[in-house]
């Protein structure tokens, strides 16, 4: 199965996960404050192929790094498969330092963009261990045909970026 997880809307007590699989899946998210030690988990969730699902992990502690992974299986299957471990940090205390990255104008939807160069840029940003990333636009190119673009075309543009954005 191919999947992507994109994190967003972090607060001092929660974070939103957007999860997308390419097959009909059952899964849960395991998470905790020590690498490899997941004391918390969500209920088992069901997702249809190629439809992103957003949900919040709530009741988190501020200024804390959480480690998480998915446990997933084909809908109706018996054995779960663990994903690699990922992490995030909840909002830091006011006045404390943090790290963020900025990216813009990658233009992967037209001849100006280069997938491998964008991948290298994201890998370099990841080395900074950012708390979050700001994107300043020209991400999807949906404004190039503003009056004629279809919902299906928008869905494809957005789906093409998930593998990139899920890595930071």
Positions of the model-derived regions?
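Acidic, histidine-bearing metal-coordination/catalytic regions of metal-dependent phosphoesterases
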Residues: 1-108, 123-128
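Active-site neighborhood of divalent metal-dependent phosphoester/pyrophosphate hydrolases
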Residues: 95-168
